Amino acid sequence: GRKQPDGAIQILASIQEPSASFIRKGRINNLNKMTSCATLIKDKLEKTLKKTISGCYVGVGGMGMHTVENTVVRHFPDKMLITNEVVDGIRDNNLQSQPGEREILEAVQQEYKLGAQTQLDPVGIQAEGIEGHFLNIVTNRRVREDIYTCFREAGLQVIDLPITFLALADQMLTGPEKRSGCVFVDMGAETTSVAVFKNNLLRHLAVIPLGGDNITRDIASLQIEHREAEQLKREYGKAYYEADDESHAPISLEDGRSVKYDDFSGLVQARL
């Protein structure tokens, strides 16, 4: 894509390749197949654009990603002015609190507590001590390592690893929604991602290993092939359906059978 002066992205080319056999619940489980897929996409894009591609942005998410609260405390012998250096040191200390086999992908700054007052920006305030509160987004260390390995083998430098779900929330949520408080839910890629915002800050994030594929499997329980169930879900599935709505005709299946729309929608709505 090409970034426009107003910040919008102009799509120059788009390539899609199936990945269900080696990416499960947002995690790579076969590095060789992932590398081959990335190489194929790179080659096709270069052929379409007639340009060499050397770097890429890779959205990260998937099962196991969640937030962990952390507090960093600093006490001073006397009341002192909080400087940028003090705040930077607190942030660095927070990033050093890597929790075991997990790593911090992003540290979301919450409030700072200085005595009895709470501030978003403590610089310039005198205090005898300061508490920095952080919400760390963590995931398994292998997630980043596997992504870098696959794309390096495909001849691509990973420029950045934005958290896909948060990038989507930033585009879809308004400022007033984040200020007043809201829950943002995204279902897809065999997972359901949930984020809570309040006072313009992320307050909680979790990725649940249940998603759209579970709906597809429920539909397949009507003796329908998984491929056809996925197609029907995309075409007819609704998050909300009123059972007394008689305007929908039965859904025709490839084998000549038909399914009542009520039965189909009941399966979809039960998951949502």
Where are these regions (language model features)?
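Nucleotide/phosphate-binding catalytic cleft detector across ATP-hydrolyzing
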Residues: 2-183, 201-203, 212, 225-227, ...
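Glycine-rich phosphate-binding loop of actin/hexokinase-like ATP-binding domains
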Residues: 180-221
